[in-house]
Amino acid sequence: MIKMNKRFYNFQNQKIELGANEVHIWNFDLDKISSLMNEFENILSDDELVRANKFHFEIDKVRFICSRGLLRLLLSIYTGISSRGINFTFNEYGKPSLIEAQNNFELHFNLSHSKNFMSVGFTKNALIGVDVELMKPLKNH
């Protein structure tokens, strides 16, 4: 079990094996780890930092930085590549994947977030899709 706490470096330098027939799903409340934003900023790419600074609302910027930082940390523990060294390629819809040179593991991942909630799924040798939506109460008529 990997614990996420205020010392996020406890989370780094770990290794998790993903079996060929396994699916790993990670769920996070981004607001509960927003205090780690400065540490996450240090592992983001320049492009990710530019994108983060385009958000109008600070809470959206913080959530973006935390979600990308978490994605990089998770990819690092599956691949052994440093969090900062992870490089992405994007499909025509903007979905990220590891560049081919870094993906000798046939690792596939997908992430989704809604407000403060983020979910990331990982598989080997198969595509994966995850989707989360926060439920909104129905109005009484």
Question: Could you say what each language-model-derived stretch is?
Answer:
Residues 1-141:
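Core catalytic alpha/beta fold that binds nucleotide/phospho-ligands
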